[in-house]
Amino acid sequence: MLRRTFIALAAVTAFIPAFAQSVVGQEAPRELTDAERQLITDINTHNSGVKTMVGRFLQIDTQGQRIEGTFFIERPGKVLFRYNPPSYEQIVSVGRGFYVVDRKEQTQYAYPQDKVPLRQFLDAEIDLFKANLVAINQSDDYVSLTLQDDTPRGVVRVALVFDIESKDLRQWTLTEPSGNELTFSLYDVEYDVTIPKAYFYIDPTFRAVNAPPNT
């Protein structure tokens, strides 16, 4: 079972579109065909019906560094990404922005909104037609929808990869204005499970600190 999981994960990771690997620049919104519009409608409908998600993730950065962890998502707006040991960090949203919490140092700092592309996916009702969709790339099994944001730091792009048959989110790749990338692949995902309320919590006694310079 574990071997099949990682084979599937490798297949999704290999599908990262080539256009997500270049330095980001402004692009005009993409004109959609009727078939593409129907596919996005189906993705919106399916994922709007999923209220909670729980599973594991693999994060890969531009240098190829790999970090794993577990995630918990509850719509609207609640997120917990917990990195595996030896890290004590986790990314938390309780519906009022995103924060990086260090459980060992008992600190927290605000995480830039434009570095959390999953926010496109956290509303109670998902409507990707409202996003600035600039590219679509499709294989037999997966479709990648590339969304673009113009932020104070420059143009940020995210490629969301969905399973064509199930319409489930499998992966996203964030491309920063510098061209640096961060890819999250999801696996062992369970849907519509009960998540303890305590998971979406930031201890008010944790000290607020400035974000690291490279954040």
Predicted regions and their residues:
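Flexible, surface-exposed loop/linker segments and immediately adjacent secondary-structure boundaries
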Residues: 105-151
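Bacterial N-terminal signal peptides
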Residues: 10-18
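Boundary at the C-terminal end of the N-terminal hydrophobic targeting segment
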Residues: 18-27
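Extracytoplasmic
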Residues: 48-52, 66-68, 74-76, 86, ...
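A short, Trp-centered hydrophobic/proline-enriched beta-strand micro-motif
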Residues: 45-62
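An acidic-aromatic
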Residues: 70-120, 182
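N-terminal export leaders
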Residues: 3-7
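Gly/Pro-enriched, hydrophobic low-complexity segments
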Residues: 129-131, 138-214
